[in-house]
Swiss-Prot record:
EC number: 1.14.14.1
Organism lineage string: Eukaryota, Metazoa, Chordata, Craniata, Vertebrata
Record-given protein name: Cytochrome P450 2D1
Cofactor(s) required, per the database record: heme
Function: Cytochromes P450 are a group of heme-thiolate monooxygenases. In liver microsomes, this enzyme is involved in an NADPH-dependent electron transport pathway. It oxidizes a variety of structurally unrelated compounds, including steroids, fatty acids, and xenobiotics.
Organism encoding this protein: Rattus norvegicus
Membrane topology classification: Peripheral membrane protein
Superkingdom as given in the UniProt entry: Eukaryota
Family statement: Belongs to the cytochrome P450 family.
One of the record's GO molecular function terms: iron ion binding
Induction: P450 can be induced to high levels in liver and other tissues by various foreign compounds, including drugs, pesticides, and carcinogens.
Length: 504
């Protein structure tokens, strides 16, 4: 009975607090070495969760970088994290230690969404045989269906024509271009995966685009961070279904499309699309428990392609049009180069890119300035590594701050301004920058980079060949500030598209 009186309750409370503090202290033992990266002192149990602004992580990390240096530490709950900033340190991690930092940390919320040891897709997969198998398949199949070849270029050019038709239908009006751009890029991915496209007013396409956006919103921000930090919360009945409702609905929609594709698949015929090619591999892998070719992983690979291949490029183009209406002189100079190299009748082709240094520089500067994936996806150390004279232990989550590279004051002349001359020499020739890495670097660099580069060039040049874009009369000048999520998109804005006349 003494346990239930005031003295007993106080004793139990004190014992519990001491026990938690001892456990917390043991979880901090990685900090006991003098060569562990410095950082703010974490709170017991919570770590640094309340010391960073999750709604604007890049700015929080920018301030911490200036206080603690290019390599510093944080703690998420009891999980150690190291933030890597600026070109030299980032290259050291992604390239010099590429093999040792190619893994992904465990992410509890993704287990609720169907990620399992043999069904991790490509982007979230642990670094190992399954990841190699799926990356090799994805790259090979994308090449088969035209990545870097004329066939895919024709698909993209045709879709760019449909996009231009959609803009023409609303020429002279005040519109938000985001929805149309998302639909166009969704159709490119749907062509690769299912060999089909949708009309822009098709309710199925509209719903698909909406669900992709919702699913990305659901896995970024404060709530997912809390759930990943304290995964026991995911055991609360019904919580995961409520928090990730859009993601689960999107997967159900994809399941219907995959089932539809399967009913018309003929194994005796050459594959029509990526889904057919994957199903053929599933048949070959039957009886092999070590293979990652299974129906569950097909779904995860398709989710990867839609989320990474659609929204990222559409968001970059949304930034591009925003910057064109804010910098009309840049827009006119791009149009002048288009007129000189391509003209106003012929469709742009990838072979034109080599003869269009200014347009190429503008596209690269849009990617640098837009900075749509500032923190990339986290990495995980598979062994102890040494970076910038610091020792980072095995099992540490690495956050690669690409924003600190793309906007490094020691590299770029005007890091926080839109300045296409960053990619031009004194003679006006296009120049590459080693600090330009919007697709990351190393072993886990974006596998869809060639496709994204093709889409950006063809869509951007097609649009500026056909239209002049401006801020609508009576509308305020849009902001160049982005909204931190994945991907980082500009704040909603309106533009007016006017069909260009010959010679204008």
């Amino acid at each position: 009975m003494e346990l239930l009186n005031g003295t007993g309750l106080w004793s139990m409370a004190i014992f519990t607090v001491i026990f938690i503090l001892l456990v917390d202290l043991m979880h901090r033992r990685h900090r006991w070495t003098s060569r562990y990266p410095p950082g703010p002192v974490p709170w017991p149990v919570l770590g640094n969760l309340l010391q960073v602004d999750l709604s604007n992580m890049p700015y929080s990390l920018y301030k911490l970088q200036h206080r603690y240096g290019d390599v510093f530490s944080l703690q998420k709950g009891w999980k150690p994290m190291v933030i890597v900033n600026r070109l030299k340190a980032v290259q050291e991690v992604l390239v010099t230690h590429g093999e040792d930092t190619a893994d992904r940390p465990p992410v509890p919320i993704f287990k609720c969404l169907g990620v399992k040891p043999r069904s991790q897709g490509v982007i979230l997969a642990s670094y190992g045989p399954e990841w190699r198998e799926q990356r090799r398949f994805s790259v090979s199949t994308l090449r088969t269906f035209g990545m870097g070849k004329k066939s895919l270029e024709e698909w993209v050019t045709k879709e760019a024509g449909h996009l231009c038709d959609a803009f023409t239908a609303q020429a002279g009006q005040s519109i938000n271009p985001k929805a149309m751009l998302n639909k166009a890029l969704c159709n490119v991915i749907a062509s690769l995966i299912f060999a089909r496209r949708f009309e822009y007013e098709d309710p199925y396409l509209i719903r698909m685009v909406k669900l992709v956006e919702e699913s990305l919103t659901e896995v970024s921000g404060f709530i997912p961070e809390v759930l990943n930090t304290f995964p026991a919360l995911l055991r609360i009945p019904g919580l995961a279904d409520k928090v990730f409702q859009g993601q689960k609905t999107f997967m159900a929609l994809l399941d219907n499309l995959l089932a539809e594709n399967r009913t018309t698949w003929d194994p005796a015929q050459p594959p029509r699309n990526l889904t057919d090619a994957f199903l053929a591999e599933v048949e070959k892998a039957k009886g092999n428990p070590e293979s990652s070719f299974n129906d569950e992983n097909l779904r995860m690979v398709v989710v990867d392609l839609f989320t990474a291949g659609m929204v990222t490029t559409a968001t970059t183009l949304t930034w591009a049009l925003l910057l064109m209406i804010l910098y009309p002189d840049v827009q006119r100079r791009v149009q002048q180069e288009i007129d000189e190299v391509i003209g106003q009748v012929r469709c742009p082709e990838m072979t034109d890119q080599a003869h269009m240094p200014y347009t190429n520089a503008v596209i690269h500067e849009v990617q640098r300035f837009g900075d749509i994936a500032p923190l990339n996806l986290p990495r995980f150390t598979s062994c102890d590594i040494e970076v910038q004279d610091f020792v980072i232990p095995k099992g540490t989550t690495l956050i690669i701050n690409l924003s600190s590279v793309l906007k490094d004051e020691t590299v770029w002349e005007k890091p926080h301004r839109f300045h296409p001359e960053h990619f031009l020499d004194a003679q006006g020739n296009f120049v590459k920058h080693e600090a330009f890495m919007p697709f990351s670097a190393g072993r886990r660099a974006c596998l869809g980079e060639p496709l994204a580069r093709m889409e950006l060039f063809l869509f951007f040049t097609c649009l500026l060949q056909r239209f002049s874009f401006s801020v609508p009369v009576g509308q305020p000048r849009p902001s160049t500030h982005g909204f931190f999520a994945f991907p980082v998109a500009p704040l909603p804005y309106q533009l007016c598209a006017v069909v260009r006349e010959q010679g204008l």
